[in-house]
Curated annotation (Swiss-Prot):
List of residues that carry N6-carboxylysine: K123
Entries under SUPFAM superfamilies matching the protein: IlvD/EDD N-terminal domain-like, LeuD/IlvD-like
Protein name: Dihydroxy-acid dehydratase
Chain residues that bind [2Fe-2S] cluster: C121, C196
Documented EC number(s): 4.2.1.9
PROSITE patterns: ILVD_EDD_1, ILVD_EDD_2
Domain of life where this protein originates: Bacteria
Signal peptide: none
One Gene Ontology CC term in the entry: cytosol
GO BP annotations, alphabetical order: isoleucine biosynthetic process; L-valine biosynthetic process
Entries under Gene3D superfamilies matching the protein: IlvD/EDD C-terminal domain-like (3.50.30.80)
Organism: Bifidobacterium adolescentis (strain ATCC 15703 / DSM 20083 / NCTC 11814 / E194a)
């Protein structure tokens, strides 16, 4: 197979291109080696990305040593935690598609032969995955790694262990805490570089990347602060050169992203996601990834999987365990191992480093006698409790692995943390095309809920009614016109879910939105309602006092109105202002462009390809 870069490295026509490569530091004697694009996302705004400049240099050196030509570039990264609660959050989800575009543009414009992606936080991971699946060249993912959890000591001497970003958000709405208490949380909940501690969106996506087969073992769970992460970066760099040579020298197309990320691989990844109670945002992103890969994987597949897979890992914010605890229990291969023993996975899939799932699990599942010493050692990587934005600050190890599948961080199928899966798809007259709830984070006592609606038309209005105590126990807060088109941008609702907990009513209210929730959200928080209000969805017809009925066991969500009543309301709405939010929000041209092409949440909130084809006139 001729390398993509061969056209530039040979012949008189492209002498100018070679001159530019020489000027950028490529030695002429290296012409003919595979050009490996390093898609980095270094960014000083985000603790999850602040160290990636060092990672990029490390990977670049390792690629060169392995026989490739490393060429590093950067794309953007939005910090959802910083963008949260104001109009900045409108830009988060749209950035995913722009990130995908930037990687595609850069790689194709410069004829790169292979790609190594260094994402970490929420939208960067799926954006790069979408690009890799579009490009379909040899690709390896290696993320920046998760942050350590913090330890907070309050002024009165109270010690709070395993605190994270969500704790400071809860604290900010707790009227019982003073400013000194709040400052103590603020200073300690994010102690290291890395993606926010807990099974939030970033860590969920990095785990999913490992499960689908495009990253090496440990990608989802080795802490950013641990020296073993440095080893992982080097191995990833060596692996991308190896598979580039397999493809171009040996005509082995099994190493390509689309050969790895088949429908069966998507089903395995989603099975793992449901089993670990990942962020609801993973549903949006895996649907978008499937479209980029031309794989027929839909919300119906996710709904089917959610009915058959229990939750066997309840990590923060849904449970007591931190990412480092999940790592000690064997990480993602530990979860996959339990699912494999239960017959829940397709075995005829492969990955960037193994020809079969069975071979990988034989080497990396700590519950198997065949598990390698390398794997056992890697899964001992522990927090170092060194407060620093620098990576690789320590070599701390746990005393032992967690092989307790009854009471440990990872359970076996016979002793699940929750008998139902950690994610569920609900449908009903309020969400005909579906909606999503993170069941792992919902207290069992409110899996069924019936209460009057309190309707708002923006996240800002939602925050106001929570903080001024308009939202009462027993109510269902309906937040509409925050979908992909209606927002536009489909904001996350972490502040509302955090503030109801801070107010002490987290187990007494429901939230429903055509927007989405942070991976850090928990409680009865139903998102991705489709169709959204701006697309004439029934959520646009709800009025204050309407009775909302939620039944997670039976997977339903309804408003107690007849079809005739809903039809009458629709006629009245369309005779009036129509499907328009009543709020004061200025929308930029950039966001209007996103809204113009955005599809519904049940389609991954991606751009509408048919509309693009129609308007462009291009096939």
């Amino acid at each position: 197979m001729e390398m993509r870069s061969a056209k530039l490295m040979n012949g008189r026509v492209f002498a100018g291109a070679r001159a530019l490569y020489r000027a950028a530091g490529v030695d002429g004697k290296d012409f003919g080696k595979p050009i490996i694009a390093i898609a980095n996302s270094f960014d000083e705004f985000l603790p999850g990305h602040v160290h990636l400049n060092k990672v990029g240099r490390l990977i670049s050196d390792a690629i060169k040593e392995a026989g490739g030509i490393p060429r590093e570039f950067n794309t953007m990264a939005v910090d959802d935690g910083i963008a949260m609660g104001h109009t900045g959050m409108l830009y988060s989800l749209p950035s995913r598609d722009i990130i995908a575009d930037t990687v595609e543009y850069q790689v194709n414009a410069h004829c790169a032969d292979a790609l190594i992606c260094i994402p970490n936080c929420d939208k960067v991971v799926p954006g790069m995955l979408m690009a890799a699946l579009r490009l379909n060249i040899p690709t390896v993912f290696v993320s920046g790694g998760p942050m350590e959890a913090g330890t907070t000591v309050l002024p009165d001497g109270t010690v709070k262990k395993n605190t994270d970003l969500i704790d400071v958000m809860y604290a900010s709405a707790d009227d019982n805490l003073n400013e000194e208490d709040l400052l103590a949380y603020e200073k300690t909940v994010c102690p290291t570089c890395g993606s926010c501690a807990g099974m939030f969106t970033a860590n969920s996506m990095n785990c999913l990347t490992e499960a689908i087969g495009l990253a090496l073992p440990g990608n989802g769970t080795i802490l950013a602060s641990h020296s073993y992460r440095k080893d992982l970066f080097k191995r990833a760099a060596e692996q991308v050169v190896k598979i580039a040579k397999q493809y171009y020298d040996d005509d082995d197309d099994s190493v390509l992203p689309r050969s790895i990320a088949t429908k069966k691989a998507f089903e395995n990844a989603m099975t793992m996601d449901v089993a670990m109670g990942g962020s609801t945002n993973t549903v949006l992103h895996i649907l978008a990834m499937a479209q980029s890969a031309d794989v027929d994987f839909t919300l119906d597949d996710i709904e089917r999987i959610s009915h058959t897979v229990p939750c066997i890992c309840k990590a923060s914010p849904s449970g007591e365990w931190e990412i480092s605890d999940v790592h000690r229990a064997g990480g993602i291969t530990g979860i996959l191992g339990e699912l494999d023993r239960a017959g829940k996975l397709h075995r005829d899939v492969h990955s960037i480093d193994y020809k079969s799932l069975e071979d990988k699990l034989n080497d990396w599942d700590i519950m198997r006698d065949t598990c390698t010493e390398e794997a056992k050692q890697m899964y001992l990587a522990a927090p170092g409790h060194i407060v620093s934005p620098e990576p690789w600050t320590h070599t701390t190890l746990f005393d032992s692995l967690d092989r307790d599948r009854v009471n440990g961080a990872i359970h076996d199928i016979d002793h699940p943390a929750v008998t139902e899966g950690g994610l569920a798809v609900l449908r009903g007259n309020l969400a005909p095309d579906g909606c999503v709830v993170k069941t792992a984070g919902v207290p069992k006592e409110i899996w069924t809920f019936r209460g009057p609606a309190l309707v708002v038309e923006s996240q800002e209005q939602a925050i106001e009614v929570i903080l001024n105590d308009t939202l009462k126990p027993g109510m269902a807060l309906v937040i509409r016109y925050e979908g992909p088109k209606g927002g536009p941008g489909m904001q996350e609702m972490l502040y509302p879910t955090s503030f109801v907990k801070g107010k002490g009513i987290g187990k007494q209210v429901a939230m429903l939105t055509d927007g989405r929730y942070s991976g850090g959200s928990s409680g009865l928080a139903i998102g991705h309602i489709a169709p959204e209000a701006a697309n004439k969805g029934p959520i646009a017809l709800i009025k204050n006092g309407d009775i909302i009925n939620i039944d997670i066991p039976n997977r339903t969500v309804n408003v107690e109105l007849s079809d005739e009543e809903l039809a009458q309301r629709r006629a009245e709405l369309e005779a009036g202002d129509g499907y328009v939010a009543h709020r004061d929000r200025k929308v930029s041209q950039a966001l209007k462009a996103y809204a113009a092409f955005a599809r519904s949440a049940d389609k991954g909130a991606t751009r509408d390809p048919e509309l693009i084809d129609k308007l462009s006139g291009l096939a």
